[in-house]
Amino acid sequence: MTRVKRGSVARKRRKNILKLASGFQGAHSTIFRTGNQQIIKALASSYRDRGKRKRDFRRLWITRINAAARNNGVSYTKFIRHLYKNQVSSNRKVLAQIAIFDTNSFSTILKKLSSGESIRYRNFSPEFYSGEVRTP
């Protein structure tokens, strides 16, 4: 049986792995074995954290909505219950943005929901829809 020479293939593979590890510190960017281990670890972490980022943002939005709702004397759970009861379809990201950047509109939403009125978006303050982004 003839000998299979694959030095060029192996060199190319190692070179590509080390290119992926080019920004790593110390031996992780120069030695193939440690670099390969760090690449595997980095890819696993990025895969895991893509799902974690979604959970973290949802938790942040819920915290912001809860804080804004409690400033108006309503708990988060009661606020969400009123949303579902009045069939308002709005996600937590949008509600958190309204709570931060337009507190008057958020207060109006809370009052209308707790009183049982239907919500019409034209009743919100015009600054919110003018395109200006105010920082708190």
Curated annotation (Swiss-Prot):
Has keyword ATP-binding? no
Instruction: Keywords in alphabetical order, please.
Output: Chloroplast, Plastid, Ribonucleoprotein, Ribosomal protein, RNA-binding, rRNA-binding
Q: Which domain of life is it from?
A: Eukaryota
Q: Which GO terms describe its molecular function?
A: rRNA binding; structural constituent of ribosome
**SUPFAM superfamilies, per the entry:** Ribosomal protein L20 (SSF74731)
Please tell me whether the keyword Ribonucleoprotein is annotated for this protein.
yes
* Localization per record: Plastid, Chloroplast
One of its GO biological process terms is:
ribosomal large subunit assembly
- Gene Ontology CC annotations of this record: chloroplast; ribonucleoprotein complex; ribosome
One Pfam entry name: Ribosomal_L20
Q: Which PROSITE patterns match?
A: RIBOSOMAL_L20
Similarity field: Belongs to the bacterial ribosomal protein bL20 family.
PANTHER family attached to this UniProt entry: 39S RIBOSOMAL PROTEIN L20
Write down the NCBIfam families for this protein, in alphabetical order. rplT_bact
Q: What does this protein do?
A: Binds directly to 23S ribosomal RNA and is necessary for the in vitro assembly process of the 50S ribosomal subunit. It is not involved in the protein synthesizing functions of that subunit.
What is the official name of this protein in its record?
Large ribosomal subunit protein bL20c
